[in-house]
């Protein structure tokens, strides 16, 4: 709950479902969180985001500063998309979100019904941000990675 003196950003009240990892997606959702959006980062419950282990440097609590910096101001939830209950929770999050951000390989979320077409069937007003290494034309099926590109 907000205190009367708490400054709210211009995106206060906007809910972002963040299915991204590493840099491009987390950086985009970090900027939205910095402006007051509620960002809910979905991570693998066993491993978390790959960058949780990237370092050095690490904080005095042993956390990777890279992960901490690009995931600041976010909430996090561990969901295994291969588990039916967790998948339902992820789909429900996408159904209620104002924005969905993902950077899976093209087609990677189709089998989970978290792709653009599936999400917009139940949430037609959603802003769906799909980040890929090589766009939607030639080479779209290739995996892209920040340092590769």
Which residues does each predicted region cover?
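N-terminal helix-loop segment corresponding to the beta1-alpha1 unit
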Residues: 1-149
């Amino acid at each position: 709950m907000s205190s009367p003196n708490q400054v709210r950003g211009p995106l206060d009240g906007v809910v972002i479902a963040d299915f991204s990892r590493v840099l491009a997606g987390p950086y985009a959702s970090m900027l939205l969180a910095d402006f007051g959006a509620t960002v809910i980062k979905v991570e693998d419950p066993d491993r978390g985001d790959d960058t949780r282990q990237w370092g050095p440097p690490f904080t005095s609590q042993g956390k990777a500063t890279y992960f901490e910096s690009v995931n600041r101001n976010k909430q996090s939830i561990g969901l295994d998309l291969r588990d039916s209950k967790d998948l339902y929770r992820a789909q429900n999050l996408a159904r209620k979100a104002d924005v969905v951000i993902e950077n899976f390989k093209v087609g990677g979320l189709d089998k989970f019904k978290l792709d653009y077409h599936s999400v917009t069937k139940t949430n037609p007003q959603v802003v769906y941000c799909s980040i890929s290494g090589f766009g939607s034309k030639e080479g779209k099926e290739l995996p892209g990675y920040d340092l590769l590109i």
